[in-house]
C-alpha cells in the first residue's frame, strides 16, 4: 500500500519503499506541516547524492549534516537540532539493528516489544511512538500481537486522530479537523481555569 503523507506522489512512494525514510519523516513530524516533514526524507536523500543510508548519516560530521538540513529550503523549521536527532536515530539503527531500519519492527515479538523499540528511538515520545505503531499496523500490515492495544487510541479502527489514519486528501482533512477540535477544547479549558 502506498502511503499518503507528504501530498507528493514521489515522496510518498519513497516513504512506502524505504523504512529509514519513514522513520526520519516521523521524527521530523513536529512543529512543521506534516507534508513538509514527510517530504524531507526524499529531499535529504537527494542532497546526500541520491541515497539515504543509515551508516553514512551516522558517520557524517554533525556540522556537515546540519548544513545539509539548513540548505534552502530547510528540511525543518529547526534544522540543526533535527539534523542531530536524525543522526542519533541513524546511529541507533546502525548499532542496534545492523543498519536496517525495518528491523525495528520486523524483529518485534509483540505489540509491547514494538512500542518499546520505537519509544527508545530519538525523537519518539510516548504519543509519537504509539502513532508510529498504529501507522505500521493500519497501513503497512505490521501487526504483532497486541499492537492495537499498545497504540490506543491511535490504533483504533475508524479514527481520524493522526498520520496513522491518513490515506487520502479527505482523511487528511478529517485528521486536521480533529486536531483543530482538540486544540480549541484545550484553549477553552485554559481560558476558564
PLM region descriptions:
Residues 38-44:
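Short Gly/aromatic-enriched secondary-structure transition segments
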Residues 1-13, 17, 111-116, 126-193:
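C-terminal accessory module of base-excision DNA glycosylases/AP lyases that mediates lesion recognition
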Residues 11-21, 32-34, 76-81:
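Structural motif
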Residues 23-27:
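Short, aromatic/basic-rich helix-turn unit that serves as a nucleic-acid recognition element
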Residues 31-36, 48-49, 94-97, 140-141:
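Short alpha-helix boundary/capping elements
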Residues 48-119:
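Alpha-helical ds-nucleic-acid-binding substructure associated with the helix-hairpin-helix region
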Amino acid at each position: 500500500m502506498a502511503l499518503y503523507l507528504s501530498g507528493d506522489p514521489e515522496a510518498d512512494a519513497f516513504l512506502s519503499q524505504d523504512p529509514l525514510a519513514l522513520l526520519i519523516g516521523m521524527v521530523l513530524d513536529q512543529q512543521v506541516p506534516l507534508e513538509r516533514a514527510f517530504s524531507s526524507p526524499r529531499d535529504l536523500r537527494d542532497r546526500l547524492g541520491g541515497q539515504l543510508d543509515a551508516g553514512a548519516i551516522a558517520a557524517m560530521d554533525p556540522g556537515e549534516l546540519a548544513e545539509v538540513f539548513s540548505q534552502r529550503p530547510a528540511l525543518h523549521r529547526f534544522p540543526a537540532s533535527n539534523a542531530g536527532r536524525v543522526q542519533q536515530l541513524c546511529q541507533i539503527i546502525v548499532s542496534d539493528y545492523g543498519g536496517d531500519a525495518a528491523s525495528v519492527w520486523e524483529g518485534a515479538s509483540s505489540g509491547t516489544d514494538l512500542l518499546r523499540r520505537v519509544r527508545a528511538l530519538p525523537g519518539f515520545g510516548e504519543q509519537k511512538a504509539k502513532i508510529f505503531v498504529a501507522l505500521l499496523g493500519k497501513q503497512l500490515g505490521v501487526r504483532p500481537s497486541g499492537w492495537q492495544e499498545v497504540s490506543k487510541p491511535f490504533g483504533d479502527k475508524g479514527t481520524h486522530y493522526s498520520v496513522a489514519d491518513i490515506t487520502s486528501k479527505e482523511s487528511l482533512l478529517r485528521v486536521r479537523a480533529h486536531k483543530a477540535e482538540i486544540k480549541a477544547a484545550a484553549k477553552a479549558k485554559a481560558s476558564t481555569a
